[in-house]
Design a protein with these regions (language model features):
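C-terminal beta-sandwich interaction modules and adjacent acidic
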Residues: 1-296
Length: 296
């Protein structure tokens, strides 16, 4: 059995806020023990960006590399050179979570063209003939607002006359009248997105009613800004030719890590939208778009 190194934090969910104290242990398990040249830890956090090939083109996205935004970077000595005895040995550590030189921390986010990650990297250098022990552990940073935003509910009415960007071939589609409301367009990221939709009237049979969550990521580069929208998730809230004049609940949980509070920085933006989509059996589809602001 070979020696192993692991990093454990004092919080199971590994969620921390700016300026909190992060505590944990480096745990080394060794059947025979060994000598080492020190136990070192590195804490790093950065926002990494890349250009969309669709928005910037394949050539531009390959050669216009966008430098990452460094948020946190420091080294932390855990133990000096010495010996690890046989069995399990634990080395405690702690540090304050704060940005470099007054840099504000951004919330953890795993996107397509923008990602914000925070990691603890721990290395134990052993003798010349032995491989070093290495462990990388990601932890999550949440950045709450001091005051909540107003809910800003919004009602909607959809008829053939209210549609925009309609192909000429669909201008004579059968009549429909759809109403509804969303309870918040300023949404706490830890609460569900809710509302209701009512099919007041529809001459054509309906196939499904769906709710889409969209991320809109914008990345600045030397020649301008590349903006790209991608789907995070799609929730079916109605199946088949749904009943007319009956409220269909809108309910969607914002997925952890793949969503975050709306971020607007000089280097990039991460924004969110929801689409209510009604798909008819004849293949026609209508979409109502709601830009939303997420906050914690």
């Amino acid at each position: 059995m070979s020696s192993t190194l692991d990093v454990k934090l004092n919080r199971i969910d590994r969620i921390f806020h700016p300026h909190e104290i992060v505590q944990g242990q480096v745990i080394i398990s060794s059947p025979k023990g060994f000598s080492h040249q020190g136990l070192a830890m590195k804490v790093e956090g950065s926002a990494r960006m890349q250009l969309s090939t669709k928005g910037a083109g394949l050539f531009e996205s390959f050669y216009n590399n966008v430098a990452p935004l460094e948020l946190v970077y420091f080294h932390l000595p855990v133990a000096p050179a010495g010996k690890v005895p046989p069995g399990i040995t634990k080395f405690p550590f702690e540090f304050e979570l704060q940005g470099n030189d007054g840099q504000e921390l951004l919330e953890t986010y795993h996107g397509v063209y923008v990602s914000v990650k925070y990691e603890i990297v721990c290395d134990c250098i052993r003798g010349i003939m032995k491989n070093k022990l290495h462990k990388t552990l990601e932890f999550v940073v949440e950045v709450p607002l001091r005051e909540p935003l107003l809910d800003s509910p919004e009602e909607f009415h959809i008829t053939p006359e209210s549609l925009e960007n309609v192909r000429p071939s669909l201008s004579a589609m059968p009549y429909f009248h759809i109403t509804g409301k969303v309870h918040r367009t300023n949404c706490p990221v830890n609460l569900p997105f809710t509302g209701e939709i009512i099919i007041e009237e529809a001459k054509s049979p309906i196939k499904s009613v769906e709710l889409q969550l969209i991320r809109v990521e914008s990345v600045a580069h030397a020649d301008g800004v590349v903006r790209d929208a991608t789907e995070i998730q799609n929730v079916q809230i109605g199946w088949g030719d749904v009943c007319r004049q009956m409220a269909i609940p809108i309910y969607m949980i914002f997925p952890r890590l793949f969503t975050c509070p709306t971020m607007l920085t000089p280097a990039f933006k991460v924004e969110f939208e929801t689409n209510i989509v009604v798909l008819f059996e004849n293949g026609n589809m209508i979409t109502e778009n709601f830009p939303i602001t997420l906050y914690r």
